[in-house]
Amino acid sequence: MYAIICFDHANSAPLRDKHRAAHQDFLKRNSPRILYGGPLKDAADGPSTGALIVVDCATREEAEALVAADPFKQGGVYASVAVRAFKKVFPQG
């Protein structure tokens, strides 16, 4: 299991809007591997500034390939992406 942490470029809202439909299609196509995810925000009611996605991938390379195919990554929305091994410990699982 891996956590994918993405941070947007400043002022990337127009790019998010441009690639949103393709990004949502990408998420749907890959839903068997995506355990959960959603936007990161600086304030609860603020704009998206990134994303956190937890995926069921066997290797870091598989998780990196998955995010590399995301239209938000390909379209220049994300300034940085980190892929880290993740272990769920709470709640018990």
What residue ranges belong to the model's regions?
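Conserved, structured core segments of small domains
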Residues: M1-G93
